[in-house]
Amino acid sequence: MCLPTIKAFKTILDAGSHRATQLVPLKKLKAEFQLKSDIYVKLEYLNISGSLEDRAAHRAFEMSNGIQRGDEVYVTAGGSSAVSYATVAAVKGVRLTAHAPPGAFDQVRTILSTLGTKIVELPVSNFREARLQADLLAKRRGVYNLDGICEKAAFLANLEGTAPEIEKAGKTSAVVVPLDAGGASAAAGIAAYFLKDQKTTVVGVRSSASASASAPAPETEVLLQKYKVEIRDAPESYTFTRHLIETEGIMAGPSSGAAVLEAIKLAKDLPAGSVVVVVLMDGIRDYLDADWMKVNGKKPIKPREIFDPKVLDYDPTKMVGEWKSSSKFRPERPLVLDSVLDAIGKTPLVKLQHVPKAHGVRCNVYVKCEFLNAGGSTKDRIAKKMVEIAEKTGKPGALTPGATTLIEPTSGNTGIGLSLVAAVRGYKCLITMPEKMSKEKSTTLSVLGSTIVRTPNEAAFNSPSSHIGVALRLKHEIPGAVILDQYCNPGNPLAHYEETAEEILWDMGDRKIDLVVLGAGTGGTITGISRKIHERRPNAIVVGVDPNGSILTGPTTGPAPDFYEVEGIGYDFIPGTLDEKSVDSWLKSDDKESFLMAREIIRTEGILCGGSSGCAVHYALEQCRKLDLPEDANVVVLLPDGIRNYLTKFLDDDWMKARGFL
């Protein structure tokens, strides 16, 4: 294979602006509603900060002439829209203040704070009044106000970006767009693009569901009329949105659910063979605390108190079977996918521009943004691979849609990945997870339709009350249950050997790779990536990071903590999927440094990463200094997941202060 020149992105904004969002057909809903037309959804929640508004925010800053790093800027925006503007501001080093009516920041307050955005709730009843007050404040202080160009930016971003992507995907009869937040300008821009052939209808759906709902500016209403956007009012659609998530694995927010429901109604009136595209406004991140997200109708489940001790006869330190690569590598996601599972992999590699220099590091540091996988983490890869192997070979158990229950002990992300795969493939899913794992993970699992069983943090892996022990007991009680077992399944390292490592090598092109730094949990990530990197770049050094309190690298030197807060890395046993010989050296990590680094990456690079990502980057920089890597050296760090799972944890100042981290 001929490698390209380096394809890593200069900033996370470049990754967003140069990567189209994919379209996915709703096959199950088509059958359920007996439609003769096809409905596709455009996955705008896989943009860099999670919504369609990313396009408008980036364009608005491009259109704002004269804004320099360090300048103060105002914008009127709430919810996911505010997060989009805050992300761009973080990358550009701009001091952003977001204004909005009361309540508009409720679900995104910690995100905005971590991004460094100041928020001001104005004593007004709607966004139009907020824009007027913000404009007066900006003029009084001599501050640049983006409000004057936001609507135009959204119009142009969707006219020149979203609409051509839809057209490129194929013939479209109708496009449905939520009108919440900047959706009205987006709908107008898309309609303006398709007006040229008058064969595509654009429908705007008004819904009260969005956390960032705002009335469009008067000039936008004129554009909606000018470009013949058909307006429909949608009823409450929370129940349907849950159904969309559980049925198709489309992790969309409520205004997007309302738009899909309207698309179904529209499709019934269209000729057979028509195509309707729904532009999804945002994902589930900003709604995880909403009541509609928490009720999935699953009855609580516990294993029987009395059980045969033989069910615990299990050794997670031995891998079951060998693994070898057989698949062909595809470097990019196609524009149209077969299912949302095809939006797993091909995540962007981004160069850090500010953090390394701030910590005395001269070399190039690139981060692989795994939070842009379909389910939000690198564990999506192994979930998909393990299910594919089981479907093909019947190992470790035969899978039957509608009958099989997938059971998995996990720290959360593998469970989310498996829940996503189970939703699409038609399996039931039960996740056992320690109590310390975030409530956001639990809610995400719930909305995907999984049953969750929590277990004590202090239970050792071989205890009957641990997440592993409970999973083993439940497997023997539930007919047709299968544990795919990430600790022993060869599909775990294989996914990273075949895909993740290949993507890193492709994106680095003909550049040398001096150092790769990876956090270790089950060990599948580091084993798979390390083997492939060593095969193709034998001079590269692969370093694993393991938290104090974990034993993956042996006992901690000095007093070991009984508990560590960073999720997704470390264990109290050596999993069978970890090949210790594939790792050149190990570093021990602490919680405080990990979380502070994650917050710094978010604030200065605009990369919305999780705590284990901060852990990997902090200790990568430490290793860079130790090795005294020169300016032309290249370092790659994997960011396993994003902020969605930690909104009430390390993003929250009170949580950090309570643990002595701030």
Curated annotation (Swiss-Prot):
Example GO molecular function: cystathionine beta-synthase activity
Pfam families: PALP
EC number from the UniProt entry: 4.2.1.22
Cofactor (UniProt): pyridoxal 5'-phosphate
Keyword line: Amino-acid biosynthesis, Cysteine biosynthesis, Cytoplasm, DNA damage, Lyase, Pyridoxal phosphate
SUPFAM superfamilies noted in UniProt: Tryptophan synthase beta subunit-like PLP-dependent enzymes (SSF53686)
Superkingdom: Eukaryota
Top-level EC class as recorded in UniProt: lyase
A GO CC term attached to the entry: cytoplasm
Chain positions recorded as pyridoxal 5'-phosphate binding sites: N413, G521, T522, G523, G524, T525, S612
Pathway(s) served: Amino-acid biosynthesis; L-cysteine biosynthesis; L-cysteine from L-homocysteine and L-serine: step 1/2
Tissue: Expressed at a high level.
Record protein name field: Putative cystathionine beta-synthase cbs-2
Organism the protein comes from: Caenorhabditis elegans
Lineage, top ranks: Eukaryota, Metazoa, Ecdysozoa, Nematoda, Chromadorea
